[in-house]
Amino acid sequence: MLFSYLLATLPLLANAALTYKGADISSVFIEEKAGVAYKNLAGETQALEAILTDNGVNSIRQRVWVKNGDYDLTYNVNLAKRVAATGASIYLDLHYSDDWADPKHQTTPDGWSTDDINTLADQIYQYTLSVCNTFAEEKINVEIVSIGNEITSGLLWPLGKTPNYENIARLLHSGAWGVKDSKLATKPKILIHLDNGWDWDQQKYFYDTALGTGLLTSDDFDMIGVSYYPFYNEKATLASLKTSLTNIQTTYGKEVAVVETNWPVKCSSPEFAFPADLKDIPFSVDGQVTFLQRLAETLTATKASGFFYWEPAWTKNAGLGSSCEDNLLVDYNTNQVRNSVKAFGQV
């Protein structure tokens, strides 16, 4: 009887192990403005965030840019209100830029200092504080705040560009305290995000060097987030990811999550070879399910917090910046979600 009971509860235990089964839907307002009306599995028109949460998504990631316009603070407050109505938690991804921030682009916002680190450190603090206080005033709870996006090469260039880790550490410290000093009643988890989550050497070098300056302390942040895209490097195996996530937690004592990932339904001419332990997964809707299941198994095995699927419904950008033609969980011809969306509720 006891053995049978344990077998019956194993799926429940696996589900409970993943705190976050999330998606980044930052582009949703732009899509809706372009006339896209999303359809659920039954073919009925429904808000994207509701479709996702109905299928097991429990957290939504939103990118925040500094300049007024798409992805600005007002854009994100309005999106967060819709997300909050579904019961999903909110994860703000502060790019600290007027445009895309990633390992190749970390452009300082217009009007922010590019020649004085004291001024820039105050600007990142004041901006972060203002963003968080705005959400507090709107009575919107925030679960996670990322102080930068894929900052492997630093943030707020040129002052915060590698190899100037003293400036990087100081800026991260200032950003973190913008969150800590805010009026948010429940303080969000503060997250630092690098790319190539499978590359332990890269992760270790960044954190050892930044923390080694003494200007960023372990108390400044709560989580480490990583991107995991299998189609950018043959070395990006699940085995390597497992090793890296395990080492991150053991070395730094931080909660860890895969905060960006996706899998293609079509990839005719991949720029890079796919990792060996993923080559058997087809480029298809079923393949998306298999990939997310294996990823979830890896995360559960390492006691990681969860994952966020990056832009599953950006129908005007189906390749999502990769060499694959289509990485979406939505059919861009019909705007209907694919059956793979059910994977969130199955992992």
Swiss-Prot record:
InterPro entries: Glyco_hydro_53 (IPR011683), Glycoside_hydrolase_SF (IPR017853). Its main location: secreted. GO terms for molecular function: arabinogalactan endo-1,4-beta-galactosidase activity; glucosidase activity. Belongs to the glycosyl hydrolase 53 family. Keywords: Carbohydrate metabolism, Cell wall biogenesis/degradation, Glycosidase, Hydrolase, Polysaccharide degradation, Secreted, Signal. The gene is galA. GO terms for biological process: cell wall organization; pectin catabolic process. It comes from the Eukaryota. GO terms for cellular component: extracellular region. This is Probable arabinogalactan endo-beta-1,4-galactanase A. It holds the Pfam family Glyco_hydro_53. The keyword Aminoacyl-tRNA synthetase does not apply. It catalyses: The enzyme specifically hydrolyzes (1->4)-beta-D-galactosidic linkages in type I arabinogalactans. Its EC number is 3.2.1.89. The keyword Ligase does not apply. Residues 1-16 form the signal peptide. It is found in: Secreted. SUPFAM superfamilies: (Trans)glycosidases (SSF51445).
